[in-house]
């Protein structure tokens, strides 16, 4: 899980790989994988799971990739000693990963410093959708639509977009317009979403 409220001990045990208290669970995973058709490559969805890299690599002899996409937000939710220990454990296991995939140039630069990952070991694959083969659809309405698709949190700036939308509506007068927002929202961001709704109520 990437829930920052989970106990620090659980995070550390996940990062300690098969040398921690979760060794039995790691062994079960490895035994199961050995009995299945082997993949061409294994991708860990975030660096908080890097403790699996070594055991999986040894069991499958397949390349290990690890996606980097904002783990520092969850690490910052840990209490000081746990955060420092978690970062140290991730750094210790960077060598077990063949390739890191960052979702932006900023992420690549930030994670290079945070986890001491050699920059040459990181490939940048921006988030997005390939539009080849698709055509623009006609609008189903004349409304001017502003869209937001990202995690709902202050650092993503939905409140800034809401303020801008309020100004836009005032400049547009009675012309039809709407703001459509979608994305993951953690339980700890409910009050933030209510603040954004309050801003939009002025539109």
Task: Give the location of each predicted region.
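Membrane-proximal helix-turn-helix segments that form the acceptor-binding/catalytic region
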Residues: 30-34, 58, 81-100
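A short, histidine- and acid-enriched strand-loop-helix "catalytic/donor-clamping" loop
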Residues: 17-18, 47-51, 67-82, 96
């Amino acid at each position: 899980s990437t829930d920052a409220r989970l106990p620090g001990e659980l995070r550390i045990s996940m990062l300690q790989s098969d040398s921690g208290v979760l060794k039995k669970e790691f062994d079960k995973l490895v035994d199961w994988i050995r009995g299945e058709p082997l993949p061409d490559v294994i991708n860990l969805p975030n660096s908080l799971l890097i403790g699996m890299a070594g055991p999986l690599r040894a069991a499958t002899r397949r390349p290990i990739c690890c996606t980097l996409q904002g783990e520092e937000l969850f690490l910052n939710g840990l209490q000081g000693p746990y955060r420092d220990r978690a970062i140290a454990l991730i750094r210790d296991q960077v060598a077990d990963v063949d390739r890191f995939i960052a979702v932006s140039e900023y992420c690549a630069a930030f994670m290079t410093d945070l986890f001491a990952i050699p920059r040459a070991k990181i490939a940048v694959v921006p988030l997005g959708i390939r539009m080849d083969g698709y055509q623009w659809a006609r609008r189903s309405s004349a409304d001017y639509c502003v869209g937001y698709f990202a995690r709902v949190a202050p650092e993503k700036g939905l409140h800034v977009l809401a303020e801008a939308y309020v100004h836009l509506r005032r400049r547009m007068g009675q012309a039809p317009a709407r703001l459509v927002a979608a994305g993951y929202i953690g339980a700890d961001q409910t009050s933030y979403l209510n603040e954004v709704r309050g801003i939009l109520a002025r539109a």
